Regions:
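Short, gly/Ser/Thr-rich active-site loops of penicillin-recognizing serine hydrolases
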Residues: 80-82, 173-186
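Short, well-ordered alpha-helical segments
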Residues: 95, 99, 170-177
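Beta-lactam-recognizing serine transpeptidase/beta-lactamase-like catalytic domain environment
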Residues: 1-160
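A short acidic/glycine-rich loop-to-helix N-cap element
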Residues: 160-174
Length: 186
């Protein structure tokens, strides 16, 4: 599990011209710690950017791309001065594994807890997640996904912090749906 996390960039600095927090996946864990870490507990640290990049890699057949904060630079009359080209960062997993995970993510939106992220007429791939954050009974609620699943145009990650489980899942999937609809003009 640690090697897979590293393959998706956990514990590595993102080389982008912006200060961002580094995600981490602990090493040298006991079996019980590894079990907790495998579902995002124990001492796993991540950011919405890292989670969105992971979903984007699944959408892209296992290839993770370097994130860009802007697509192009335009002049005052809106002609393109410079356009950034997509740049491969790493191969995170095989196409076979990425395709299987994609199928599971589509099923999670079509038939599972992530159904709130569904967009009419669009096949959406997504996954919810809940991270316990202490003894308060509150959690961090996540949704990540991409759409359209068969020809991805957008990959996202949404997190609501310090929230109860049922409210968090509803809010995070609804926010995902709204992002998909806005970008895909639905």
């Amino acid at each position: 599990i640690s090697r897979t996390a590293e393959n998706f960039g956990y514990g590595q600095d993102l080389k982008i011209p912006l200060a961002v927090a580094k995600s981490s996946f602990p090493k040298g864990m006991s079996q019980s710690q590894l079990a907790q870490a495998s579902v995002g507990q124990y001492d796993v640290r991540t950011t919405p950017l890292q989670v969105a990049m992971t979903s984007a890699a699944i959408a892209n057949g296992g290839v993770q791309m370097k994130p860009n904060m802007i697509r192009s630079v335009k002049t005052s009359n809106l002609s393109v001065l410079y356009e950034f080209s997509p740049e491969k960062l790493r191969t995170s997993t095989s196409t076979k594994v990425a395709d299987q995970v994609k199928q599971w993510m589509v099923n999670s939106v079509d038939n599972g807890i992530a159904s709130g992220a569904g967009v009419s007429g669009v096949k959406v791939a997504g996954k919810t997640g809940t991270a316990e954050i202490g003894t308060t009974g509150l959690n961090n609620s996540w949704f990540t996904g991409f759409a359209p699943a068969d020809d991805p145009k957008i990959a996202i990650a949404v997190v609501y912090e310090d929230i109860d489980v049922s409210t968090g899942a509803k809010l995070s999937t609804n926010a995902g749906k709204q992002l998909f609809e806005a970008v895909l003009n639905k």
